[in-house]
Amino acid sequence: MRLAVLFGGSSNEHDVSIASATSVIMNLDKEKYDITPVYLDRENRFYIWGENIESIQLLKVGDELTHLKKIDDPISFLKTFNCVFMMVHGKNGEDGILASIFDFFAIPYVGNKPVASMITMDKIYTKDILERNNISTAKYISFTKYHDEYIMKGISFSWPLFLENIKKKIHYPVFVKPANSGSSIGVIKVKQDAFLEQALIEALKIDERVLIEEAILGRELECAILENNGEVLASRVGEVLAGDEFYSFDAKYHNQESKTVIPADISLEDEEKIRKVAIQAFKTLNLHGLSRVDFFLTPDHQVILNEINTIPGFTTISMYPKLWEASGISYSELLDILIVESIKK
């Protein structure tokens, strides 16, 4: 089977995408698949890996173009493959843009469908849908920047009045989050008024839609979802022990003190509750193929859904493949299932 592994892209998760794709390629069965790595640079130009497939593990961020040859007609090129394994995180990948293009040109791909991806990429839309379906999430306030106006609950504010209004509504600590961003990029924990404005400014650099969310006191847990032969499966539950105050981008990829525990040391009752809610959320959002669902478990055993990732990380330290390995599905078997399911849809 001819398989293209697509990675890179213009999002701020570009480097994570390279690491994910490299790990995927190294774990694919080379006897089953004729693999071609396809790289998207930061301007979304397509390139083909021009060297031996095994040497991709030597790819270093910043050196990509020395190993790659430009593709002039990417659609015609990708149509020659049986499947595209999409490892483009963040913008254009998780938001359904590439999926829309692949659907239009009838190119099979690993990943969620466009509309579900677009909705789930936006934290505000996701929370609204989940709450309407009785799935608990953290309390929040959201707003949209429209030119020089700041729109909250249908009311337009100037920046000074907006800040004044927001400060009256929130109780610290809170998390300020861009609505459309992954890997915790742009997420800032704020404990007092003095730091709120700068956190909002930083979030607005990433997205014009921002949410301010209550900080939940609880353990950070994750569950992987996989669709196989028409059945939605939930993995064992893992726990994140963040090396920083929360599981930020730096804590995930740079802090050696961050750890994961699989399976999590929680009761079977709590684990089953988390797995059940993860499947419920997956189906409610009309997702297909795969996702990773992140939760908080409070001291009084409330399960609160934090976020859903439709193209979870596949790096050597990523939870998604590790959770399935702990559930009896090896990394290579997991990739096989994802590819087979993508061709069916």
Predicted region positions:
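Active-site nucleotide/adenylate-binding loops and adjacent lid/helix of ATP-dependent enzymes
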Residues: M1-F7, S11, A19, I75-L78, ...
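ATP-binding N-terminal substructure of ATP-dependent carboxylate-amine bond-forming enzymes
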Residues: M1-V115, I119-Y125, T144-L161
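Hydrophobic beta-strand scaffold residues
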Residues: I35, P108-Y109, T137, V174, ...
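Glycine-rich phosphate/pyrophosphate-binding beta-alpha loops
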Residues: G90, S184, V240-G243, N309-L323
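Phosphate-binding site of ATP-dependent enzymes
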Residues: I188-K276, L297, Q302-I304
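Conserved metal-phosphate-binding beta-hairpin within the catalytic cores
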Residues: E214, C223-I225, F282-F314, W324
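Active-site "cap" helix and flanking loop/linker of ATP-utilizing ligase/carboxylase catalytic domains
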Residues: E239-S291, M319-K345
